[in-house]
Design a protein with these regions (language model features):
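Compact mixed alphabeta submodule
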Residues: 44-94
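Acidic, glycine-rich low-complexity segments with interspersed aromatic residues
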Residues: 1-49
Length: 94
């Protein structure tokens, strides 16, 4: 599950069946794309609201190939261009 490491750094997990070589994942590693970050409080939460957190960028050398339930998945750290608002940060992390 995605999680904040701080109010400006997010540890992100890709969708299942993604590898470091997947086109979708490769887009994170280039500055050709502007990354807009949206998040919901929890996958288990019945609330379907997404919160816009701002723009972000991939932190070099942070991507890792992992397995989840026997399926490939990629994790990486993303740095937000601006800190998440204090109240929104606590809403998403508490």
């Amino acid at each position: 599950e995605d999680r904040f490491l701080s109010d400006r750094i997010l540890h992100y997990y890709s969708k299942n069946n993604r590898k470091l070589t997947s086109k979708e994942v490769q887009k994170f590693f280039t500055d050709k794309y502007r990354l807009l970050l949206f998040m919901k409080k929890s996958d288990a939460d019945d609330n379907k609201d997404f919160y816009y957190l701002g723009t972000c960028s991939y932190i070099d050398s942070s991507a890792r190939q992992e397995n989840q339930d026997g399926k490939p998945i990629v994790s990486m750290n993303l740095r937000l261009d601006n800190r998440v608002n204090y109240h929104l940060y606590h809403l998403l992390t508490d």
